[in-house]
Amino acid sequence: MKLKNPDKHQTLSSNAKVDKIATDSLKNETDIELKNMNNEDYLRMSEHESIDPFVSASTIQTGIGIAGKILGTLGVPFPGQIASLYSFILGELWPKGKSQWEIFMEHVEAIINRKISTYARNKALTDLKGLGDALAVYHESLESWVGNRNNTRARSVVKNQYIALELMFVQKLPSFAVSGEEVPLLPIYAQAANLHLLLLRDASIFEKNGGLSASEISTFYNRQVERTRDYSYHCVKWNNTGLNNLRATNGQSWVRYNQFRKDIELMVLDLVRVFPSYDTLVYPIKTTSQLTREVYTDAIGTVDPNQALRSTTWYNNNAPSFSAIEAAVIRSPHLLDFLEKVTIYSLLSRWSNTQYMNMWGGHRLESRPIGGALNTSTQGSTNTSINPVTLQFTSRDFYRTESWAGLNLFLTQPVNGVPRVDFHWKFPTLPIASDNFYYLGYAGVGTQLQDSENELPPETTGQPNYESYSHRLSHIGLISGSHVKALVYSWTHRSADRTNTIEPNSITQIPLVKAFNLSSGAAVVRGPGFTGGHILRRTKSGTFGHIRVNINPPFAQRYRVRMSYASTTDLQFHTSINGKAINQGNFSATMNRGEDLDYKTFRTVGFTTPFSFSDVQSTFTIGAWNFSSGNEVYIGRIEFVPVEVTYEAEYDFEKAQEKVTALFTSTNPRGLKTDVKDYHIDQVSNLVESLSDELYLDEKRELFEIVKYAKQIHIERNM
């Protein structure tokens, strides 16, 4: 990690001011003299002015920027917005200069310490260049047509180029999943898959105005559903494989493991989370989505400050084991919370009056879920003689940390610690930004600056960082050894807001992990990789928890509720607002007992009866009932859909009838079409499942029987 301003921060230098910063508390620092080191040793130290965490801020910024841009355009955008999105992505993934795709490859290669084969690299880069050139041509034609949508020739050109480009993606995606190279190619695969799904969405958005027939639109939509499932499965599978390959026993292996976990989350899994929201039948208007997952930046500790003393690197200095570090700093699944106060307890490492280090030795954190009770946790040494330092975090987004990894020496025994941290913060709703710092004095051997923005850069570079930041600090962990105290920061994406605000003119997705409490029998469990965060589970009947929501007027606006769930059993979902029941309905099992959670085990279904909120702030509750203990019911998120854009029950029924009929040939109503796949039948089954029991109970049962018949024929055909 390169120092951002070597002239401003003199690092590991003899007879120089330590970290001279324009703050009153540091104006009168005394000079430092290195003890027990000759000039040759000093020269070797001062050559190392960087920490090498295998991180390229520009690489990560590309992933963060694309995910952030897409989060802001979910739903059905205007044609002009689509053209603008393609323009942005082309600029990010095919910029002038060095290939961004090569940078992606090199980034993962550095983390996993393995090179992609020459053939796989060259094949991928060649195919990516072809896709980029073809996408640029399509984008240019799309812009021309958007400017004159009545021009039949322009429409014909766009249609032909669209069909050719979509086929090209189908043909080229396998180049980014070459056997044996799936892990290092994963960011490339995810970005290309994302582009393919965005392209498939175009068919549904433009519909017949783009010159496509109803049959063609249906074909592209079915492919979108199929590829969403396949691409999600691939990304989650190879992320898990990559993590398993890096799991080992010592602190150094934990560093690589954590970097891979963080960077693949940012470059791959954040995209996977939004794949389902490209479905224009389910999300026909603007949709607000949130990422509640946490990522962990590098431990704050010196890395390779002196080649003569290997143990001056924190993870070589009798640091805890891989599993001990993981247990100490990685939080167990929990409800989303926000920091309110940090109390820091310090330790003193002293060799002499001119060589010492006051360092962060432990802390107490106070945090709170949205509308919930205060939680307190402690780590490290909290019983010290040095007065603690308290920093207030309430209602502030701490978007950046600048941390000094310090080093002190007792003869040849290094001590690693953190003598100073600058916290940069902003009020989320106000144009007010400032900072706080922890610093009690340091005169050790030297420091290395670690800036969180090198690992979690802002979404854009055209605004001040306090406006365009991508993440907020959510938790602080501590790696504690006999001679090591290293901080690890946890961060959440800024899309996970503090208010759970439901808008009257958009679909609002709220992860259930944003509840303010858990009901007895409910648990937060680790997300399966494609949900954007943790999920909730019940193994016996009862409520999951309660979510505090804020409502933007008008209060006359009515909504319908949907949920993304997986279950090993048939069950009933019940919902209520402020204790008053609003919905109750029967829903089917989506998976078998013992089956792993994956994309196909989750369904998004909802209730047909609309409701409205009467208060600006309300408590929404959902529970799972009428099932046998020992089964498993999971919920990822709740969706509030304005009733005007929800498919009316009658339209839903007609659509379901059409889809069921379309499974069979026109000449033989009981003959299954040869191109019908398993996922087609599942898709139709889900559509029938969502029909209103109140209005179409008998018709729903009849359609289910037909779908079961289609499933039976399909199974027999495959046998």
Curated annotation (Swiss-Prot):
<dbReference type="InterPro" id="IPR036399">
    <property type="entry name" value="Pest_cryst_cen_dom_sf"/>
</dbReference>
<dbReference type="InterPro" id="IPR036716">
    <property type="entry name" value="Pest_crys_N_sf"/>
</dbReference>
<dbReference type="InterPro" id="IPR001178">
    <property type="entry name" value="Pest_cryst_dom_II"/>
</dbReference>
<dbReference type="InterPro" id="IPR038979">
    <property type="entry name" value="Pest_crys"/>
</dbReference>
<dbReference type="InterPro" id="IPR005639">
    <property type="entry name" value="Pest_crys_dom_I"/>
</dbReference>
<protein>
    <recommendedName>
        <fullName>Pesticidal crystal protein Cry1Ic</fullName>
    </recommendedName>
</protein>
<dbReference type="GO" id="GO:0090729">
    <property type="term" value="F:toxin activity"/>
</dbReference>
<comment type="function">
    <text>Promotes colloidosmotic lysis by binding to the midgut epithelial cells of insects.</text>
</comment>
<dbReference type="InterPro" id="IPR008979">
    <property type="entry name" value="Galactose-bd-like_sf"/>
</dbReference>
<comment type="similarity">
    <text>Belongs to the delta endotoxin family.</text>
</comment>
<dbReference type="Pfam" id="PF03944">
    <property type="entry name" value="Endotoxin_C"/>
</dbReference>
<dbReference type="GO" id="GO:0001907">
    <property type="term" value="P:symbiont-mediated killing of host cell"/>
</dbReference>
<dbReference type="Pfam" id="PF03945">
    <property type="entry name" value="Endotoxin_N"/>
</dbReference>
<keyword id="KW-0800">Toxin</keyword>
<keyword id="KW-0749">Sporulation</keyword>
<dbReference type="GO" id="GO:0005102">
    <property type="term" value="F:signaling receptor binding"/>
</dbReference>
<keyword id="KW-0843">Virulence</keyword>
<dbReference type="Pfam" id="PF00555">
    <property type="entry name" value="Endotoxin_M"/>
</dbReference>
<dbReference type="GO" id="GO:0030435">
    <property type="term" value="P:sporulation resulting in formation of a cellular spore"/>
</dbReference>
<dbReference type="InterPro" id="IPR005638">
    <property type="entry name" value="Pest_crys_dom-III"/>
</dbReference>
